[in-house]
Amino acid sequence: MKSLLLGAIWLYQKVLSPWIGNQCRFYPTCSEYARQAVETHGSLRGSALAAKRLCKCHPWHPGGFDYVPGAVPGAEPDQEQHQCTPLCNHHSEDHSQ
């Protein structure tokens, strides 16, 4: 099943995609994301990840970088490093003087 999916993705990338042009608002493109997802996570989970990505690829989504989880080492942010913290705490004081 995995090789069948990868073959379909390859066919799309080599035949259909050049003909219709690059319309994807993400990096990597949705077809490349699907290929990496199937390679990394197998047919079932890879297809689910690809379907989720395709649902986000529309004009109302800003797009940007969206890597397959676990496919690109170092591409996923360190959760502790990106914790939201308040810049200051003086906003809780009363400034109505």
From Swiss-Prot:
It is a peripheral membrane protein. InterPro entries: Membr_insert_effic_factor_YidD (IPR002696). It is found in: Cell inner membrane. It comes from the Bacteria. Keywords: Cell inner membrane, Cell membrane, Membrane. One of its GO terms (cellular component) is plasma membrane. Residues 72-97 are annotated as: Disordered. Its main location: membrane. Belongs to the UPF0161 family. Could be involved in insertion of integral membrane proteins into the membrane. This is Putative membrane protein insertion efficiency factor. It comes from Alcanivorax borkumensis (strain ATCC 700651 / DSM 11573 / NCIMB 13689 / SK2).
